[in-house]
Amino acid sequence: MTNADPHELQKFSDLAHRWWDPNAEFKPLHDLNPVRLGWIDSHAHLAGKRALDIGCGGGILSESMAGLGAQVKGIDLSNEALGVADLHSLESGITVDYEAIAAEAIAEREPGSYDVVTCMEMLEHVPSPAGVVSACAKLVKPGGWVFFSTLNRNLKSYLFAVIGAEYIAQMLPKGTHDYARFIRPSELAGFVRATDLHIVELKGITYHPIGKRFALSNDTDINYLVACRRGA
């Protein structure tokens, strides 16, 4: 059985045509991308590396990593999003190999094949995040890097990421997130410990509404990033 929620897939497929509009529903991803890209590159030094972007959607992060010199493959289960990603890759001239395949399936086919694996803003949208983390650990080469980002589960994250972002500021469409699927850092750490990955860094992401920008911080109460490495 595929580790995917049909409702979640349809939700993002319906918006796929707006993925690259920096002022539409995916504006937060566009605003967040330079921060997460810089953080990933500071650890993994992407130039010349083979990278896999799991849950790539329309390809915002995939193209950005390729632009820094990585050989990138992006995977997703939304054919609509992948169609948009392919088209934008042709328009931009930045080469990314896209495929509709689940993380668990490609892990069986290509174990230990990637220097870098990214799984950003995706774990909170699948039925079994532990299964995705396990697949990431299988996909990365010994000594390679795996990066996750997701949302903490607490009252503050509910108020800011759901009520604030979706209903008050309307930064995101209503229903984008299911609070019950948010993941505490301790829970994600448990998923990681069940593999041969180890956590190198945990960072928070803070949104500054006055400047309308994201920045790295030590506050992991809402959005957070985790850098992991596989043992050599």
UniProtKB/Swiss-Prot annotation:
It holds the Pfam family Methyltransf_23. It is an enzyme of class 2 (transferase). Its EC number is 2.1.1.222, 2.1.1.64. Keywords: Methyltransferase, S-adenosyl-L-methionine, Transferase, Ubiquinone biosynthesis. It comes from the Bacteria. Pathway: Cofactor biosynthesis; ubiquinone biosynthesis. Belongs to the methyltransferase superfamily. UbiG/COQ3 family. HAMAP family: UbiG. PANTHER family: METHYLTRANSFERASE, UBIQUINONE BIOSYNTHESIS O-METHYLTRANSFERASE, MITOCHONDRIAL. This is Ubiquinone biosynthesis O-methyltransferase. It comes from Burkholderia vietnamiensis (strain G4 / LMG 22486).
